[in-house]
Amino acid sequence: MTRSLRILYIAIFLGILLILGAWSLRSFSNFSTSAETTVLNGKWTKAAETHYDDEFPIKRLGTNLWAALDFKLFNEGRPGVVLGKDQWLYTDEEFDAVANGEQNEADNLALIQGVRDALEKQGSKLVLAIVPAKTRLYPEHIGDNKPASLHADLYQQFHAQVAKAGIFAPDLLAPLQAAKQQGQVFLRTDTHWTPMGAEVAAQQLGAAIAQKAPLEGEPEQFVTQAIETAPYKGDLTTFLPLDPLFSNLLPKPDELQKRSTDPVAGEAAGGDALFADSDVAVGLVGTSYSANPNWNFVGALKQALRSDVVNYAEDGHGPILPMLKYLQTDAFKNTPPQVVIWEFPERYLPAHNDLGEFDPKWIAELKKSRDTQENVALNAKPSESPNRAQN
């Protein structure tokens, strides 16, 4: 390399650094901190470093480039997603082995029985809505990926265990499998079900509750309408950081039909008066399958049950923590519902739960029901156990 070429190379390199540096410094025009973030306590420096790191263009370029190489060469994304066939994405929680999975299952089953007992003491009937895994409903799209053996019969084992304990858990797998012929019941790029899948589950729960735990009070009429259908970028695409440089590599967005459920005109006042201050017909506790309004699960339940439904579900905390929180609320203690539907995705049964925010003695009391009722549960007649299905 001649001296002039070396000078040109150095000049180009320095020029690129200056341009990238100036580009990053532009981000400080909208950089602001709180009053307690000062130079003296070091928080301002940390905040500035974090902001600069987030806005530095080379970082985004490197992230996009590395993600594109993983995606194209190895058919992989970041931890959290499994890439199937035909642009289908799955959460890795439905594939990975779980440390201490068997012990976690035993602990969680004990808590489930304890929750059932706590509800019954207040006069509430537990209806456990076990949501089948996406891999169980759409195994044809998982490709060469194989779930760990723990997941093979997890749904069936879950149902068998709660049936032995005498817990009412209508089967949701069979109706969801049947509904696949009419439309998509789970989103292709998301962890969750579609509004149609949520409606199928709600109808099954409504029919089962009407048969085995009919609600008291005057039925209410609800109507569901489609609002709009729009492209929807599922939560699993966040594990494919290809935007903005390689966004063309991302799976195409799902088409999500949003729905809205409202009381039939003239019914709202009567229904509100019936249950106001005296009785709550149905409470719903669960995960983002229930908490996220995009799926309209609450609305579908209202229409299927012909009753108002009070939603206590939470996004991002699994099914057990929201239920334990609900049991400690004044709403439950003062106005317990006739029925509590507990939406519980099957993959959370072997998952570990951090229960540090709860009183250990109270948790121990809840778990005691497994020991005191074990013999009764083993002799109980199974109520509704689904047939074995391939994963």
Swiss-Prot record:
UniProt subcellular location: Cell inner membrane; Periplasm
Keywords in alphabetical order: Acyltransferase, Alginate biosynthesis, Cell inner membrane, Cell membrane, Membrane, Periplasm, Signal, Transferase
Residues annotated as the enzyme's active site: 190, 192 (proton acceptor), 288 (nucleophile)
UniProt main location, coarse: membrane
GO molecular function, one term: acyltransferase activity
InterPro entries with a match to the protein in the record: AlgJ, ALGX/ALGJ_SGNH-like
Class of this enzyme: transferase
Listed EC numbers: 2.3.1.-
Biological process (GO), any one: alginic acid biosynthetic process
Signal peptide stretch: 1-35
Example of a GO cellular component annotation carried by this entry: plasma membrane
Disulfide bond annotation, renumbered to this chain: none
Topological type in the membrane: Peripheral membrane protein
Pathway involvement of the protein, from the record: Glycan biosynthesis; alginate biosynthesis
Matching Pfam families: ALGX
Keyword Acyltransferase annotated: yes
Family: Belongs to the AlgJ family.
Entry function: Together with AlgI and AlgF, forms an inner membrane complex which probably interacts with the alginate polymerization-transport complex and adds acetyl groups at the O-2 and O-3 positions of mannuronate residues. Acetylation of alginate is important for the architecture of biofilms and increases the ability of alginate to act as a defense barrier.
Official protein name in the record: Probable alginate O-acetylase AlgJ
